[in-house]
Amino acid sequence: MFSNKQVIGVVFGGKSSEHEVSIKSAKTIYNALRYLSNKERYIARPIYIDKYGYWHDYIFSESILFDKKDHLIFEERRINLTNLSNMEDIDVWFPCLHGPNGEDGVIQGLFKSTGKPFVGSGVLGSALGMDKIAMKSVFKSYNLPQVPYISLNKPDIQNNLYMKSIYEQINKIISYPCFIKPANLGSSVGITKAYSKEEFIAGIEFAAKYDERIIVEKSIEGRELECGILGKSIMKSSVVGEVKFQTDWYTYESKYNANLSSTIIPADLNIEISNKIQKLAIEACKAINAYGLARVDFFYQESTQQIYINEVNTLPGFTKTSMYPTLWEASGLKLEKLVANLIEIAKE
């Protein structure tokens, strides 16, 4: 029997340290697609990518999504990547992938080759949004406000003369404490807050385990604010939210443990600051050619009234504690409608 429902390929998992977070996000999206009015419009097809990079069929993928024990006895029917263009039942791709190979432009290029629309930014916006060094270079060219930073590559760590110049830059430009981050990871994975040269050296070595490119940023004592972006030809910004946490900084544990962090939505800000953040969020996305959906993170120093753009996340999380869907719900857009809007925007 002919069906006019659109088939949505929900792709999740992946070769990334954020694999488990991706599964949680995908479960939220998958359930939203099967909710009330969306159920009449869409058919959700989960597609799991395991930690080795193999793609799996719908049955196996659904068993992973809902942690069904019987997935252990399923025959692993892997999908041949050469046949992706022939997956005629997929109308729109919905990536729920985080980190390398998922939100860095790699899979976006693959989706583009199938000729089917996909949710989120294209190859360029995804790549720039993933690499913090490249992203900050673009922000600098657009004169967007950001904290002082320096960057280095993993091979440079062994060069004593080069590292001596880095230490001098830390003292002159950055100062302690500072953050050392892998350039291409999210969810605070691989990050260290260093209060001394010794901690800085340890942080560099730690970050180098995750990435060849490393960024060092000045630590700003201020409020951490976030704003959601939705749209392509016309971008809209959500209300501004604030993240508070019990840890020294917004660690992986505090991001995904409700007992260690809390959110205030909307944030308690005067209207001028709130409007400025919403405007800067759109400007940041346009600068790196990000569209569809994004979450833009900020630092705000009340004493100076200074706003700093931290980063643009082009595939923000969709877990129960994730800010992006929560920000939009507070803006009047419920999860089910948000997911439907993202699919329709992808087809523009």
UniProtKB/Swiss-Prot annotation:
Its cofactor is Mg(2+); Mn(2+). Disulfide bonds: none annotated. Mg(2+) 2 binds at residues 311, 313. InterPro entries: ATP-grasp, ATP_grasp_subdomain_1, D-Ala_lig_Van_CS, D_ala_D_ala, Dala_Dala_lig_C, Dala_Dala_lig_N, PreATP-grasp_dom_sf. It is an enzyme of class 6 (ligase). This is D-alanine--D-alanine ligase. It is found in: Cytoplasm. One of its GO terms (molecular function) is metal ion binding. Gene3D superfamilies: 3.40.50.20, ATP-grasp fold, A domain, ATP-grasp fold, B domain. GO terms for cellular component: cytosol. PROSITE patterns: ATP_GRASP, DALA_DALA_LIGASE_1, DALA_DALA_LIGASE_2. It comes from the Bacteria. Keywords: ATP-binding, Cell shape, Cell wall biogenesis/degradation, Cytoplasm, Ligase, Magnesium, Manganese, Metal-binding, Nucleotide-binding, Peptidoglycan synthesis. It holds the Pfam family Dala_Dala_lig_N. Mg(2+) 1 binds at residues 297, 311. Binds 2 magnesium or manganese ions per subunit. It catalyses: 2 D-alanine + ATP = D-alanyl-D-alanine + ADP + phosphate + H(+). ATP binds at residues 171-226. Pathway: Cell wall biogenesis; peptidoglycan biosynthesis. GO terms for biological process: cell wall organization; peptidoglycan biosynthetic process; regulation of cell shape. Belongs to the D-alanine--D-alanine ligase family. Cell wall formation.
